[in-house]
A protein has these predicted regions:
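Short alpha-helical segment of the dimerization/phosphotransfer core of two-component systems
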Residues: 70-76
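Conserved glycine-rich
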Residues: 224-225
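Conserved micro-motifs of the catalytic ATP-binding
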Residues: 90-95, 128, 132-138
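Short acidic helix/loop segment immediately C-terminal to the autophosphorylated histidine
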Residues: 52-59
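Primarily the dimerization/phosphotransfer
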Residues: 17-51
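Acidic ATP/Mg2+-coordinating residue in the GHKL
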Residues: 178
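Short conserved segments within the C-terminal catalytic ATPase subdomain
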Residues: 116-125
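Short conserved segment of the HATPase_c
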Residues: 183-197, 217
Length: 250
């Protein structure tokens, strides 16, 4: 009887701790959202005001317009990321579990990123075999799209991104490896935090929403998958995702 009560007390304490941690994360997230949304809005507002008041030379108009466009796109990307993370946090994603072929999904993502990879002059290759898992296609797509997009964005001209899909003892494995700029060791433990960005000196001043890899982390957790990251500065990054053992008849 005492053991049962003690166990119940421990469960209650654990739940209280989880609630407090979740509340602290929400507060931190809200503060970060306010700051991160304000930054591109300030740039857009400032540049637009200068253009409205006729203080921009005609030859500078394309540069100002491009900056406004880029910041607006970043703002849209950030808002979309916030919505996706909120849905994952609150389990409000429509749970259409189905058999998903990760090999075919990789080709879909490659096609969707064709324009981006051509602009960055980065080749995307897909290797491996057809491998199916039970999962939510929408979330799996977001996971691997964000990984691949980052691998293209933070790469070199003439670089490569390689998707490898395999299965070992009925454990589906997806590896995304790039020849990009790499991640400093001191940043590896934090890259999946919301709004965390690697030092600009290492990322060629490229801007992102800071939410892509956080979506990856949440998506992996949603599917009970394990994730490993290996990276070497100046040589590239390798992200490995290992899904739970699947039924052999998938």
């Amino acid at each position: 009887m005492l053991d049962k009560i003690e166990k119940q007390n421990m469960d209650i304490e654990r739940q209280i701790k989880e609630i407090k941690e979740a509340e602290n994360m929400r507060k931190e997230f809200s503060a970060n959202v306010s700051h991160e949304l304000k930054t591109p809005l300030t740039t857009i507002s400032g540049y637009a005001e200068l253009m409205k008041d006729g203080l921009v030379k005609p030859e500078d108009m394309p540069r100002f317009s491009a900056t406004i466009y880029d910041e607006a796109r970043r703002l849209i990307s950030m808002i979309e990321g916030i919505i996706k993370l909120s849905r994952l946090d609150e389990n409000r994603v429509q749970l259409d579990w189905e058999n998903v072929d990760l090999y075919e999904l990789a080709f879909t993502i490659k096609n969707d990123l064709t324009r981006r990879s051509q602009e960055e002059e980065v080749a995307v290759h897909i290797r491996g075999v057809h491998t199916k898992i039970r999962g939510v296609q929408q979330i799996l797509y977001e996971m691997f799209f964000n990984i691949c997009e980052n691998a293209i964005k933070y790469n070199h001209k003439g670089g490569e991104v390689v998707f490898t899909i395999s299965k070992m003892n009925d454990y589906p494995i997806v590896i995304v490896e790039d020849t990009g700029i790499g991640i400093p060791k001191e940043d590896l433990d934090r890259i999946f935090e919301r709004f965390y960005r690697v030092d600009k000196s290492h990322s060629n001043q490229k801007k992102g929403s800071g939410l892509g890899l956080s979506i990856v982390k949440h998506g992996a957790k949603f599917h009970n998958a394990e994730m490993e990251v290996d990276s070497e500065l100046g040589k590239g990054t390798k992200i490995t995702i290992i899904f739970p053992k699947q039924k052999s008849d998938l």
